[in-house]
Amino acid sequence: FWLDGAGSSGHVYNFSKIIETLRTYQPNTIVFADTALFEYGDARWAGDESGSIEYDNWNVIDRHGYLRWRPVEVDTPLRKYHWVWHPHDESSLKSLDELLNSYENSVGHGGQWMLGVAPNDQGLLDDVDVARLHELGDALRTRYGNNLVRHHLPTDANTARALDGDPDTFWSAPEGSHAASLEVRLPQPTTFNHALTMEWLVEGQQVQKYTIDAWQNGAWKTLVSGGPLGHKKIDAFPAVTAQRVRLNIVTSAGTARIREFQLFSIPNAGK
């Protein structure tokens, strides 16, 4: 449910009553609102409609000393210039590469991706739009369908919980720690160029800074470094071949917990 200010100049709304009614009849509805409507919203705006998050993404925001869990929603239209349908406008349809880039810079930065698809004047989705969505689904399954970490060498039960593909299990750093590492050993040297990491958020977003490292020539080599992780973080880096890989939690606000740590080899990524 959007509390969108577009076109509202000069109008006065009883937001408290609107939200009270919504919670009465649809209590599980997610309310989207900008930070100006801080007390009403469950999700916040990314800041524009480009389809990407270009900043460190923390789910908790602070207004006047009051903290609230408000994940970011990344809204962008399937067609480049508008949200509503226009005839003879197929040329504005975003390319598959543009959509993949948007996915990886929204979902892959811990956001909720809202891709706007408008019905035509017959109340149906245009065939070209539907075809592009099928292409996108196929491409995502191809890119992220072969998790190389699933074929890891035997490890301890704690580490295995971040490698099992089960979102209901997680690896935990030592209780009360503010730094830790999760190491994966593969059966043989393996080439990869993407990592996908998911943080366990039931007890809050904890990871503040991390690196992903590969063991090469007798030492750890950092492939990528980042700030917060959150629900899902997709990192891309030049292809590397290694048998040992680690997620290194450099700093965390509290005990870090990781739902999933996955590696992928994506051909022609970024081209």
Indicate residue ranges for each PLM-predicted region.
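Mature catalytic domains of secreted/periplasmic carbohydrate-active enzymes
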Residues: 2-164, 169-178, 183-191, 196-198, ...
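Trp- and acidic/polar-enriched beta-sheet ligand-binding modules for extracellular glycan
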Residues: 175-179, 201-271
